[in-house]
Amino acid sequence: MKAYENGGHAYHATMPTDALVRFRDIMFETKSYGFEAVKAQQWDLGNRARKLIEGMGFKSVASEGFKAPGVVVSYTQDSDIQNGKKFLAEGMQIAAGVPLQVNEGADFKTFRIGLFGLDKLQNIDATLDRLKGVFSKVA
């Protein structure tokens, strides 16, 4: 605190102003596009992406009634799908699943696909085409 009061500061304590400004700008963009439109498109994308992924043989972790529109978490037995290596080779970044922490065994593997961004919502068909192309190579 004394360093701050004396005009010094720690780098790690500075506000992430660039990220906050970008977030604000995106929120204004979303507002002008329409929150209800974005909500409807997010559900459409989420439902269609999950159907596509399940159609490729990857069962959803979420039960009916609990499937989120912005993320799909699926089971896999392939470590290179779970850790993202196969997706990365195709130019797609994923997250390595969700540790449920309910005594799942060492063989428990999931992967997570985030469906975030106005760019994805504003052209759902193109988003799904890219997703299908990647899944056809990694599955």
Q: What do the PLM-derived regions correspond to, one by one?
A:
Residues 54, 58-114, 118-126:
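Conserved C-terminal alpha-helix-loop-beta "cap" of PLP-dependent enzymes
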Residues 127-135:
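Short amphipathic C-terminal alpha-helix that caps PH/PH-like domains
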Residues 3, 10-13, 19, 37-40, ...:
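A sequence-composition feature that detects small, non-aromatic residues
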Residues 31, 135-139:
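Short, hydrophobic alpha-helical segments
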